[in-house]
Amino acid sequence: MSVSAVGSFWLSPSPGKLPRPRMVVRSSAVSVAPILTHLQKQCATPLPVLRHVADAMAADMRAGLAVDGGSDLKMILSYVDTFPTGNEKGLFYALDLGGTNFRVLRVQLGGKDERVIATEFEQVTIPQELMFGTSEELFDFIACGLANFAKKEGGKFHLPSGRKREIGFTFSFPVKQTSIDSGILMKWTKGFAVSGTAGRDVVACLNEAMERQGLDMQVSALVNDTVGTLAGARYWDDDVMVAVILGTGTNACYVERTDVIPKLQGQMSSSGRTIISTEWGAFSNGLPLTEFDRDMDAASINPGEQIFEKTISGMYLGEIVRRVLLKMAEAGALFGEYVSEKLSTPFILRTPDICAMQQDNSDHLDAVGAILYDVTGVKSDLSVRKMVVEVCDTIVKRGGRLAGAGIVGILQKMEEDSKDLIFGKRTVVAMDGGLYENYPQYRRYLKEAVTELLGLEMSKNVVIEHSKDGSGIGAALLAASNSKY
């Protein structure tokens, strides 16, 4: 998944054209308090639930490493086995394609003493028609953007003589990686329907387009954004072992020993380690789900899939809250005699909206009232607003705590194979994504769950650090550490 797709929860599915406000009469007058109480009970994540989730995550990881298709978790091999050391020197580029924009970036590296001397980046919006065009059209457009960006190179940026410019390519769509610099596109997602790419090597597609543009560059590393985040954070801190993206969608990757990956079948890396992309959004074992989750899943474009993602990531939290409020409005007259048509519109309430409501500290919760009115067309008094905030908190608390349990599951799996190498010393988890960055309550619940599961002493060794937009630099660094030179 990508920074633009996963890493920012400010993107949300367009709900389409809103219907004209029409009033529908509520069905019955039941008090809403029991609905909230029942919701809180179903969403509860006491320690035994968290422990089950962490253990199941570790077990699913093992099964996914044993054989392809062994569990819900794909456990994709990244082929990254040389990590940035800090000694890298020279000029490297990164290209990040993961949503409706792509980013191009250049970085001048100065080795151990100077590290990152300078960086520059640009963002380019992909025209809607190219998302439904041919492979050549899309990649020609990207190569053209890259060529225009490369033309502006100057100042502190200079390529050592006799070298070709090298790129780290962050491509955040489902890819079956075949080496550090090649991967077959399995299918387009996120609203893309480009013809002629599925089943092809995406690096070859880009290389051919660069040739057509007369651009003398080559891809040295193909990565997803989670792997890029890990590499970018590890460049500054050798203790980084895990990277997690929590934004519109979610994923996690970590550093694994190659001798504990049965499906590698004896292929060893020079360092004895590699990065595994867990694709943990597909995890589903033992999660506390409600009727609202089941209904939302059934109505989604991928029913029965990505259940963990649908419980913890930014694309879905607002929608779950909306579904709860709709039931409260219909069954318990939460917003009066009528239910606004807007409240019945899927995805009209976004995670940034529920985040903003939870930040309201005013006496009358004026911001909550304004958001409810502006976004869902309902009027509310103070007691109603308090209940709405409780609903938001219930859904966000569950999401944050389950994400924390997932992180502990990854650490547990690593610890089982390398006694005291994880919990016995400082271990850093690099976090990126708009949900983690912008939602303080979510962040707090995540960290509390990690502490509860590990205990106060052991959890002191686990450092959760925000690594903002690390995946672009990370991709350039992986191009450098896997450089042909």
Listing of model-derived features with the role each one plays in the protein:
Residues 92-96, 164-168, 221, 241-245, ...:
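Short glycine-aspartate micro-motif
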